[in-house]
Amino acid sequence: MINYLILRFLWLRERGFVQITQKTLVSLFPFFLISGIIRVISLSVFSEMGYINQLFSVSDWLPTFKITGQVLINLSNFLGGLAGPLSTYFAGKYTAGHYGRSTGTAGVTSLLVSLIIGSQELLLSPLNDDGVLARINLPDSINIILAIFVGYLVGQIFRFSRASDDQIVDKDYIYQPKTVRPIFLSLILAIGLNILLVIGDQANVFQTIRKFTSTFTVTDNHLLSTFMMGLLNTFSAWIGNNQVFTPNSIAEDSFALENLTYAVSHHTTTGLPHLYTLTNLYHSYGMVAGIGSGLALLVALLLASTSYKDKKVSLLSVFPSLFNYGAPFMVGIPVLLNLVYLVPFLLAPMVNMGIAAVSLAIHLMPAAVYPVPDGTPSLLYAFIGTGGSLRALAISILCLGVDILIFIPFVRLSNKVQHGLKEEGESLETK
């Protein structure tokens, strides 16, 4: 069975789109790493409700606290907004290169296509009063895989054009007008997709889709609904939805707000109206090691991986991952769309939630009902949310240990897949 899986994974890794996707994700790693470090510092240190600021009162003794925080959060949002355009750029570049076309021209064209698609007001809104066009958006919520697919389409346009069509200048530095063809077709694609998005937004198509998908998580059983929402959120991260990496507020969970009101008014967490909330189970324990228990995978890779690259990425990603921002790690390995890690990625958070649900049912620990500061390390979320319960902290550590044990067999499977890829590469070189 294991050998069959390895052969299937090897076959999948040889597909062109998979190779392009993995190259793109790995290329995004340094940008995500820098953005992640800046984001963690801005939220945890330079935010009024930040975890480090609450501990050391940074805002009281640092004169430049507010301006530094504003600069850092703006820079982080800017880099985060570039995730979509950069994904499309690298995907277009690597697709064109995969088929022997000009990588530079395809990459820049893909970048322009991404900016046009993501700026719905660009083609429909007038210029500002001063004549400045300021309608280009860098959305903070994108699906990385969709952005990669758009770049892949642009790369295919360059692929099916003639080789001479993507040369801007020849060897004598003379401009070649034929390069207009693939660029023009790519821009037509961008405008068409932009118009479709505008029409879909005006017709409430996307709102209808969101309502439809939400019905899968609504059941009469509150505990089951919480598990379903946690599973859907985790799977959404695995397919590249970067919105799930945004810090969650207790204000977004109406049941958690009811619990908080009850705890404050009754001075106890006993007899809460909603014991199994998304905040109490998923955010506190399902994400005790980050989205998909990424921190546990990071530790498992450091312990069991034979890949120097994976260990290096893991070490570089430790800081943001500790503070519940695992996006750099997920693109650097990559974990996104990696079938080897799909099962543990989905399973580990569900196991954590199961452990927490049982512990709450037998009153082994109190419920996490209190607000948690921004940028709090994921391992301490339940500890702070329960008002400092050592039993909740012990359960959190237990969940992390269980997650590491879940991931280790899959890390060893990944070692075998990478070894197989290396052997195939060496055999091709000797032919």
Language-model region placement:
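Juxtamembrane non-transmembrane "cap" segments at the membrane-aqueous interface
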Residues: 250-263, 351-377
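Juxtamembrane inter-helical linkers in multi-pass membrane proteins
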Residues: 2-7, 56-60, 167-179, 254-270, ...
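Signature of multi-pass transmembrane helix bundles
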Residues: 1-50, 63-64, 68-238, 242, ...
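A cytosolic-side transmembrane-helix exit/cap motif
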Residues: 124-132, 226, 267, 333-337, ...
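Hydrophobic, membrane-inserted alpha-helices
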Residues: 85-91, 230-232, 296-297, 323-331
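Membrane-embedded translocation segments of transport machinery
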Residues: 160, 194-210, 219-303
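Juxtamembrane membrane-water interface segments that cap and precede transmembrane helices
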Residues: 58-69, 268-276
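Hydrophobic alpha-helical bundle architecture
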Residues: 95-98, 279-284, 298-366, 384-393
